[in-house]
């Protein structure tokens, strides 16, 4: 049999097939099935910042409507509301590392540089072999320049790589004013891989 072993982000893979972040990698059962199918590594389904923000905002709106909101509530939502999905994600990483023998790569979908560096550290502590930062800056703000959108990537990379020692990859959007130059500058940061491109659902006409 041919030797298909490769190195990706410094990780030894038995073959170059990596199961991308998706519904297939969102559960331990799915991850084990992918290993049984022969993949070389898995990227766990992304932890989405937008979903956590929306859940938190919905809860705050409900509390505000019924008059149950106080200044200290902001502290509560800063941690407790975010903790539940993050804790579940950390558990999935730990369980996967215990059950499978292929590299397990965590994935964070970021739109800000606020909390994610701290979460990245916890992901490393849970045993993830590497981390994929799925960064997206929607180019729809008339007051935000292309340079400001790109700066978000570098801010997140700088903060995360200063806190973790596991390999870090960045998955980028195809919305770039100068893709070649942007890729070159990303390659000069401490990240170990650039993934092209993240995929977002678009409206369609039936």
Each predicted region: which residue ranges?
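Detector for methionine-enriched segments
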Residues: 1, 9, 54, 60-63, ...
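N-terminal amphipathic alpha-helix/helix-capping segment at the start of soluble metabolic enzymes
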Residues: 1-18, 89-97
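N-terminal binding-site loop/beta-alpha segment at the start of enzyme catalytic domains
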Residues: 9, 15-33
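Short, flexible loop segments at the rims of nucleotide/cofactor-binding pockets, characterized by
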Residues: 18-22, 81-83, 172-173
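Alpha/beta enzyme core
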Residues: 28-68, 84-105, 109-206
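Short glycine/proline- and acidic residue-enriched helix-loop micro-motifs
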Residues: 71-80
